[in-house]
């Protein structure tokens, strides 16, 4: 899967919107029943580039053209939400752990992680990663507390089939606002 180009000139005006698909039924007596049909939320990220050099302009236009707009998902390294440090994954007897991102008390699994360092009771232990699952290479104590540090990517796609860039001055570009939506 392609990674979004490393261009860090986003404007500070960006938003993340969390959406669930909740079905609500109300009986004649007023009793309410709810059910969600999604296991995890869909996120919509709205952002824009405040500044692009001519080289960055060509890079980003080429990237979106290679995706054919919203046709192909890609990996997004979010400027604010992209790493976990000291996240507790479980205890040693399990041996396999799901990488997650923390939102307060809510944990959401992530599939694309890199720069992973795993600790058993605070000591670095060797590990390998496969689609968001962290495997310990060697056995550790059954009650060892397993924590990890890692960088994660969001799997997203363009919400629309278009991406617009404005030429502000000579050799100075900025993008219009664009939306990304998570996909699984």
Regions found by a protein language model. Name each.
Residues 54-60:
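Short, conserved charged micro-motifs
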Residues 61-128, 150-184:
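Extended beta-strand solenoid/passenger and fiber regions
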Residues 44, 113-117, 145:
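Exposed beta-strand and adjacent loop surfaces of beta-rich binding modules
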